[in-house]
Amino acid sequence: RYRIFSQEVQSWPDVNNVTYGKTVDADAARRRAYGFRTFPAAGSACSFLVLNDIHGKADYLTRLCKHVDFSELGFVAFNGDMSSSVESGEQLFKAYLDASAALFAAETPILFTRGNHETRGVFADSLGDYFPGQDGRFYGIYRYGDVCILLLDCGEDKPDDHAEYNG
């Protein structure tokens, strides 16, 4: 179980001199801690949801998942093109991360693999900061009990000189 707290840093003029503000409980109204689960070491049952081609439409994501019981799922897989490009951290939250947190991400694990659109945009190189994979890669093999899950990163589908990139 875990809770989320935040403490303001009011000033930090040097490494040995930090002035802190008050600490706040980010979710005081919740009244209970979040749960957290890892993948089981054994077992043959595996239920999961795959989401892709959301293209930053958080309202669509919310409607799509309206009747999903996430407590019944082992994980959710983001299977590419969750946004149309990657322009900033703020854009990722607006595009789908805030909606995902409200729906399931506080307690349901996410597996992430890039689509061709996640390789586009000025912030694309920072995407791994939000979805750290095995050894910094967006591909890999995961075990969920006796089930083996293979994530592939197929990258971009067009050369750099393609007309879509003004080439």
Please name every model-derived segment:
Residues 1-50, 70-72:
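Acidic, histidine-bearing metal-coordination/catalytic regions of metal-dependent phosphoesterases
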Residues 43-59, 68-165:
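Active-site neighborhood of divalent metal-dependent phosphoester/pyrophosphate hydrolases
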